[in-house]
Amino acid sequence: MLVKTLGAHFAAGQNAKKCSCCALLISLLCVLLLSLNPLPVTSHVTSAGSSTALSSDPNLVLVNKCCEKFEIHVDHECQQVNETDYFQPMFTSYGGEQNRPVKFKFVIGIPNCGSMQMWPIYHYAGSSDKLVLLDDGRLRHYTNAENEAEERHGIQSDYEEDIAGSLEPLYHDYDKGLYCIDKATSSTGEENVLFANICLARKEIKWSDSNFLLRKILNPIFHGISLVILLVIAIIYFILPTLRDLVGNIVTTIAMCLMVSQAADLVRIFTELTSHVSFIVADIILCFSLLAAFFWLNSFGFYIWKTFRSRNVFLRVTDGRKYCYYSAYAWGCTATMAALAVFAHFFLDAESYKQEHMVGEQETIGWLGICIFFAPIACTILVNIFFYVTTRKLINRRTVYGRIAHKLKANFIMFSLMLLVMSIAWLFLIMSWLQMEGLLYAHIVVNALQTPLLLYICVLRQRHVTFLLKKTCCYNEPPSANDWGDELHYMNGNDY
């Protein structure tokens, strides 16, 4: 049995005209987006002649073919074959009479499903799915048919919820433009296989399916929980006055960047069945926010490394100016690399490659853009490892610690743990794009654990942070006689 994932081949590749003037390009794109109506299928007619001549013949039946006329599906892609192996459709009447003589024309291309979901169907000997091409150009899809008599006398289904106790639907008819059909073979020698891409108005939800539960139910829930946790971290470091130093501002910014990435990934989950513009915009925002988070983490590591190397250490004296410098570095590098990645995707990446690597009907950021987005992240991780190793050596050489040294050491430990957690989550994100279900499930689990670990690292593990939270939240309690404030209370307690 063939694997039920098959990249359909776009027949009429359109070469987008590139304009050097940015304003003109933006205006043209706006006009095109407003004026274009969704077509029923991305296709072209194989024979010469005008569309008027084709539509004027009432006996001519248009058949939507996935590949070119001289191609069939071989191992998940369209390949050219000999003329003897061409796909010859067999038409069946509504009464079940097979091999009907019908005058037809091929319309090449996969269906433009729009908001509906494209779904691959295979018809081979012994399969539960049967594909029948009707003599008016419609495609009939039989499901759960046990024999041919049951197929011919099946009950039509509109994929709506049936009343309890009624019979299950046995077939559904797809109009022209909502399907494409073709012949399929495999290198293992499986012949006489029919393949079709159909547009499902509503995919049947199987709540017992672990894949559906993990990807469409638990994954969005995990993203929502992560958004709440990151918001809590950002609020704590932004509201408490004693935490609003340079390190606190950096942690707040990293939390906000990760919030944007989680929100963009959540949008990607729910836009797989909608306009490709929303999907690719969410893809770009996801990569942009992750890149910004790692540049800010790199700024955090540089600050700690430079402070430990400096002999004259003064905290919170020029934090505002330093934050401006780090902001210029982090946001400037992020914006530059993001602009290069977007430019490379739209203008340098091959059009055929972008058409072959899609999620359903949605265009995604290509590997060229991903490399430009994520190569700097790999570089910042390596630089941060250098900061960690050299700073660790400097800490081991110290024999005397004061309050400032304890606080710097606590910040160094927080930086190290954040680097470890964020790097592991980033690696699993990359591996999840390798089209392997196991890696995707691992990424969902790791992404769900990332933000609770960050909450522990940045808040729960920091005793002075929990002390400030208790002092701020429990303001109605009578003041303790031993309460000397945050700075004096932890001057020699080594609670950082």
Swiss-Prot record:
Instruction: Please give one Gene Ontology molecular function term for this protein.
Output: G protein-coupled receptor activity
Write down the membrane topology: Multi-pass membrane protein
Its localization reads: Cell membrane
Q: Which InterPro entries match?
A: GPCR_2-like_7TM (IPR017981), GPCR_2_secretin-like (IPR000832), GPCR_Mth-like (IPR052808)
User: Sugar-bearing residues?
Assistant: 82
User: Is Ribosomal protein given among the entry's keywords?
Assistant: no
Residues on Cytoplasmic side: 241-246, 298-327, 388-411, 460-496
Q: Which GO terms describe its cellular component?
A: membrane; plasma membrane
Which PROSITE patterns does the record match to this protein? G_PROTEIN_RECEP_F2_4
Which CDD domains does this UniProt record tie to the protein? 7tmB3_Methuselah-like
UniProt signal peptide? none
Q: Which domain of life is it from?
A: Eukaryota
Keyword set includes Membrane: yes
Q: Where are the transmembrane segments?
A: 220-240, 247-267, 277-297, 328-348, 367-387, 412-432, 439-459
**Which residue stretches are annotated as topological domain Extracellular?**
1-219, 268-276, 349-366, 433-438
**GO BP, one example?**
G protein-coupled receptor signaling pathway
Give the chief site where it resides: membrane
User: Per UniProt, which keywords does this protein have?
Assistant: Cell membrane, G-protein coupled receptor, Glycoprotein, Membrane, Receptor, Transducer, Transmembrane, Transmembrane helix
Q: Which family does it belong to?
A: Belongs to the G-protein coupled receptor 2 family. Mth subfamily.
The molecule here is called Probable G-protein coupled receptor Mth-like 5
Q: Which gene encodes it?
A: mthl5
